[in-house]
Each structure stands twice: as C-alpha cells, then as structure tokens.
C-alpha cells in the first residue's frame, strides 16, 4: 500500500502530515511554511493561485479571491449562516440549481467542494514533492459537529482533487490521537478546538491505545473569522465617525481592513495594545485619507464578549452527555489558532476549573493526528483503536411531522440500527422515508438529509404492513438508509447524498476539470523551467562571448550571436518545444566558445604546479605547525 497522507483542511489554513519512520512529520509547502492559507484566487489571465500566492494578491483582487469556503461546504443557500456570509464576503455567493450555496467567479460558478479540491491539490502536491512519489490515499479531517451533507461534500472535494479518501476523521479526535499516542496512563481529556471557522468540543477516554470519544458538541459557524469581523466592524465604524466615509462600500479597502484586523487580533495575544495603520485607505474631494488607530486587548475582548459567551454552552452539553463533571476531566487540550487568544484560554479555565494544556502545536496537531490515522489504516501504527461517535441524532419523520430518532447523538460509529414502522392510512401503496439529522422534536426543525420511497406495498389496513427502516453509519460518519417491507421482502435503499449535494455526474465532470487544470499547471511549470534554463544559457553565453569572443573565428561568433537572438525570440512565445530546440541549438553553436574558455582555464591552471613547488617551504612550515599541534596534544596528555 502506498503512503497515506493526513490533511487538515481548515477554514483559514490547511496542513499536511505523514508517518515516517514511526513518527508523524508535518510537511512544509513550496514556500517553506508548514501551514498553507486555504485561499484560491483567479487572476485576470485565467491563472489559478493557491495558498500564500492567493493571499498576497487578495487586496488588489478581492472579488476573485475565495477564502473560508469551508463555511459554505454542504450548506443550502437559503440559510441564516449563508445569508450572514453573503453580507460580509467580497466575492459573490450564488444559489445553485440544487439549492446549494456556490460562488461565482468571473462569470463561472464553482461549488465549495470544487474550491476545496484546489486547496487539497496543493496539499497533495506538497506531499508529493517531499516524498518524490505520487500520492493518492488520504485521511481528511472535518469538524466533529459537521453533519452528513458537510462530510459527504468534503469527501467529494477529495475525489475531485484526485485523492482516494480512506477516512473522514473528526478534528478533535485527530488532535487527541496526536496528543495521546505515546501516553501510557488512562485519562479523560477534553479537546477544545476553536479554529478559523468552526468550534468543537469533544470529551474522550484514553487508555491502552484505545481512544474512545464519549461525547461531542460544537458550532460549525463560530471561529476566528467571526472574531476578525468584530474588529473590522469596529474599525469601519470608528473611521466613519471620524471621517464620515463608510469603508464597507469599497471592497479593496475592506480587504485591507480584514488583513489589519487579523494582524491586530494576533498581536494582542502577546501585547496589551497594538497600532492599526493603513495609509491611503480611501480618498474624497479633500484628498487621500489615512487610517490610524489603537486597539487594546481589553477593547478586543469587549468587542468579542458575545462570541466568547457562545463557547460555554457546547462545553457544558458535552460534559453532561459524557456524564462527567469538569473536575473529572484530567486535561484540556487546546486546538486551533484562536486558542492562542488569552481571553479564550481564560474562558476555558473558568469552564473546566483548570489551566488548559498547551503542550501541542494548535496549528499542526490535527494534521499530525490525521497522519497517524493514515499510518493506522496502512498498518504502520499498531495497537491503536479509535472509537468515534456520530455528533447528531438520526431519524425519520413519522405521523404528526415528528422526528423519531433511530440513532442517538454520541453513538459510537460505525453502527447499524433498525426499527419497524407501519402505514398511516388504509391501503397505502407507498411510504416516503424522510431522513433527518438533528436534536429537535419536530421534523421541520431538523436538517433534511434526503427522501426516498418504498413502493408496491400490498393493500392492507393501516398499521398492518411491517416496514423495517435501517440506518447504517460508516466509519466516516456518512449515512446509508434502507427500508424493507417485511411482508413482501421488497427493499429500497439510498446512500444519503442529501437533498442537495453533488451528483456523480457533477463530481466526475469536476474531476476531469481538475485533471485538466493539473495538466495546464504542469505545462505552465515546464514553460517557466524552460524559460529559466534558456535565460541562464543566453546570459552565460553572452558573458563568455564578451570575454573570449576574440579566441574564435568571426563565422563561429556570428553563429553564436544568431543562436542567442533566436533563443531570445523563442522565449517571448509560449511554445516549450521551440524554446527547448533553440536552447539545444545555442548549446551546439557555442561548442567552439566553450573550448576557448576551457583552454584559457587550463592555461591559467598550468601555473599552479609551479606555485605549489615554490610553496614547499610553506608546506614544511605547515608540517611544523602540525608538529606543534602534536606537541601540544602530548603536553595535554601529560
């Protein structure tokens, strides 16, 4: 089995790790960073930029730079979360034909899995460059509180990126795996994961290589992006009060505010006050305007007080579901960049009554855990058993529009559960199975995962037919449902792809597009490499021609000059083969010149033996030095 990589596909940043020599290794990208911004930009030339390259040009290209796409993955357009995103995003979020939230960039629509796939391709390439071989198998992490639609969409993203997703693993569980791999003692831990866009809390029991999740809870729309937005709004409001100009109408200015807000928030984790300076942020009739203000840590905490308050509820629920009091938790592990904020750490200490453990790198620990899980699946890591849970209850709609639960939240997965139902009216020929996920009593208040029909039920009075509904959740937390008429043996089943989601045809089309983009990227890289090689050769040839041109005949010199000119002309075009041919032609033409350079070097080198002979006395002096050193060693020994 080939190498299995572990990818933390984050809202703000992504990270990739692998097991090597029995140890997890985080792989640095081509820019030398161990994390990669989860950003994708589309340049005017049609070129796609990913990661740091996309982030660097975001200010000048805000409408075509996509970030925090994870917050849209597996979501319907007509939801409060998406409406909130639309109000603050510089890029265009649109409604797809299936009702999902997609993005529109330069007139082309992209699904969130498609955009996430571009980031995953970057992580795949990072791993391949490091390993020197093709990688296809991967473990990808998701927030523990992701529902089935979001998990399926993440798996689709992996497929579009050309990855065989062996397992979808919950982020807090991955972090626990990284933390507890070498721990021998039994302990109960809480993993507090506050990242760029999501918040998870999981309670686990660790012991003898068994990692058992007891409960999980969270909020898939609470993270660093929301904290940044509070700072952005404050800066914009203060500037409007001061200058009478609302910067929210200027997308370029807004992108600068976003970067400044994120920077200020990070700086306030280690200092009590920071300066925000944005020269030439805008202009009016009186001239250019500069933005200069101070933000204190106390002010930041006041701005984000409501968000900090939201952290407590899920923690209390998770503890209650696990049947534990805060004092029974041995360690609280902090995961996600936002846990560096002192106010978050203070809130964690208040909830659990103990100082959190800061022994893991919050940016890398999830990818490390995914890498370890990859090692487990490959058989490289022995004696590790991961028992995860489903974060939300699963059930179907029954008479009176009530949700009847078949599998309760925090049930260990994989699992399978069946229940027998009947018809609601006489001679009912078919039943519609409305599959739901959530904790509310009424069906309409929960998330619809899908609908399917069991038909051909023989005429019978209500309550007589026996319809067995079976829920099956796999190790990825993805749901399969079947319904069987026990009287006739007739069965109907579906793998839930949600009432929205991507069809197989759409995924296949996106896979083909991703492959063609990868081929385009390869061609671009080949062109750049060919140009670089040609440029180096042309420069060195011209330099040698100036120095040694008088050592060769005029005809040879003319041939070389013509070959250099032909190569420079070829470099102006995009034909890789033409550049390579012109490069070869120049190499051939400059053979005589190379001989002249070599001959001169040999002549200069000919003086060296004489110099060495003259230096005999120096050599003897050198020997004396060695003797002296030797004498000193002797003295030391004495």
UniProtKB/Swiss-Prot annotation:
It comes from the Bacteria. One of its GO terms (molecular function) is ATP binding. Disulfide bonds: none annotated. Induction: By stress conditions e.g. heat shock. Residues 628-638 have a biased composition (Acidic residues). PROSITE patterns: HSP70_1 (PS00297), HSP70_2 (PS00329), HSP70_3 (PS01036). The modification Phosphothreonine is found at residue 198. Pfam families: HSP70 (PF00012). InterPro entries: ATPase_NBD, Chaperone_DnaK, Heat_shock_70_CS, HSP70_C_sf, HSP70_peptide-bd_sf, Hsp_70_fam. Belongs to the heat shock protein 70 family. Acts as a chaperone. PANTHER family: HEAT SHOCK PROTEIN 70KDA. This is Chaperone protein DnaK. It comes from Geobacter metallireducens (strain ATCC 53774 / DSM 7210 / GS-15). The lineage of its organism: Bacteria, Pseudomonadati, Thermodesulfobacteriota, Desulfuromonadia, Geobacterales. The gene is dnaK.
